[in-house]
């Protein structure tokens, strides 16, 4: 009898070891596809990113980073219901995940669900375990901007830049706020700081053109306009310039 029991134990242990090894192989494969998906996402190759992130989840359905990355990809593709679904999956898998709280809070504010988004981000901003508080505070600033509370937005964004003076999204938002407040020199200063850490976008160029025009810097206006038309010819900002040009 004891030999039979021992044999059963050995079989159970062997099966458990096989399952553990198989699961490890799946998890390792999931991590590889997650890294590939994130890389393709950063390069703007959304089709390849989607394929790899979905494979990562197929290999390991509990991969929180893969679900968060896929949610962000769906946002880029304007598939907001699919993005919400991914965020809600992560909420069930790991409700205390700080990256989830930050991204989901931002997502909710972008969808104009301000009460839910601000509540989630404010909770995170009081969490001492948050290793990137400037991102959280910037997202709070963006929420407040969406709500029309420019004063609170500026307060949060200023705090974010005190925590990380090189954080590009906060610099970009402060450039826009300064321009809207007719504080053109400050807008230009924030742009120059932004350009030290991030590339130009059609939006930054558009604000730069308006800012330099307000400051009377005609040479800079021509340079920024030319850069916009050459590098982003199909952007809405370039179309606006072309439509307003007397030589169109």
Which role does the model predict for each range below?
Residues 17-35:
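Bacterial Sec signal peptide processing site at the extreme N-terminus
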Residues 196-248:
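Terminal, low-structured helical/coil segments at or just beyond the last alpha-helical repeat
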